[in-house]
Amino acid sequence: MGLEKSFILFSLLVLVLGWVQPSLGVESRESSADKFKRQHMDPESPSKSSPTYCNQMMKRQGMTKGSCKPVNTFVHEPLEDVQAICSQGQVTCKNGRNNCHKSSSTLHITECRLKGSSKYPNCEYTTTDSQKHIIIACEGNPLVPVHYDDTV
């Protein structure tokens, strides 16, 4: 009888885990490289962003769920060009690690900054377009971007 109860409880546990696991969200299975692409790559946008670009993109790319991400940068260049930065000048990252690389040329970027008066869930951002060098952290073999470190 005890073995039968254990089997039933185990079966119920497996069933519950089967329901819970698919609802854990994309972020829990997202690789660092995929997260970098989601948070920072937007090669399709025109050279000049609209004033509401950041409000739309930050929400669309999942950076206003649970809280407002204070700062984010989108790169408007082909992914291959950004991946190529991983073989360019190596520099020290803000956190002291040595896996960062600085772009040899300027890239079209949009910087999104949370407005001072903005509070979750109504995240509002300022949108600033510019041409600047970027610094990204790269990992793996082959090296791929996994973190946006700075704009210079």
Curated annotation (Swiss-Prot):
Report any Pfam family annotated for this entry: RnaseA
Xref: InterPro entries: RNaseA, RNaseA-like_dom_sf, RNaseA_AS, RNaseA_domain
> For binding substrate, which residues are annotated in this chain's numbering?
K35, R38, K69, P70, V71, N72, T73, K94, R113
Give the residue ranges for region: Disordered. Answer: 31-53
* Record GO terms (molecular function): lyase activity; nucleic acid binding; ribonuclease A activity
One Gene Ontology term of the biological-process aspect is: defense response to Gram-positive bacterium
Q: What is its EC number?
A: 4.6.1.18
> Gene3D superfamilies recorded for this chain?
Ribonuclease A-like domain
Q: Where in the cell is it found?
A: Secreted
Q: The organism sits in which domain of life?
A: Eukaryota
Residues annotated as catalytic? H40, H147
* Enzymatic class: lyase
The record, for SUPFAM superfamilies, names: RNase A-like
Give the keywords, sorted.
Answer: Disulfide bond, Endonuclease, Hydrolase, Lyase, Nuclease, Secreted, Signal
**Catalytic activity reported:** an [RNA] containing cytidine + H2O = an [RNA]-3'-cytidine-3'-phosphate + a 5'-hydroxy-ribonucleotide-3'-[RNA]; an [RNA] containing uridine + H2O = an [RNA]-3'-uridine-3'-phosphate + a 5'-hydroxy-ribonucleotide-3'-[RNA]
What is a single cellular component term in the Gene Ontology annotation? Answer: extracellular region
Paired cysteines (S-S): C54-C112, C68-C123, C86-C138, C93-C100
* Span of the signal peptide: 1-25
Q: Where is the composition biased (Basic and acidic residues)?
A: 31-45
Instruction: State how it assembles.
Output: Monomer.
- Which PANTHER family does the record match to this protein? RIBONUCLEASE, RIBONUCLEASE PANCREATIC
Query: What is stated as this protein's family in its record?
Result: Belongs to the pancreatic ribonuclease family.
Q: What does this protein do?
A: Endonuclease that catalyzes the cleavage of RNA on the 3' side of pyrimidine nucleotides. Acts on single-stranded and double-stranded RNA.
Question: Can you say what this protein is called?
Answer: Ribonuclease pancreatic beta-type
Q: Which organism is it from?
A: Rattus exulans (Polynesian rat)
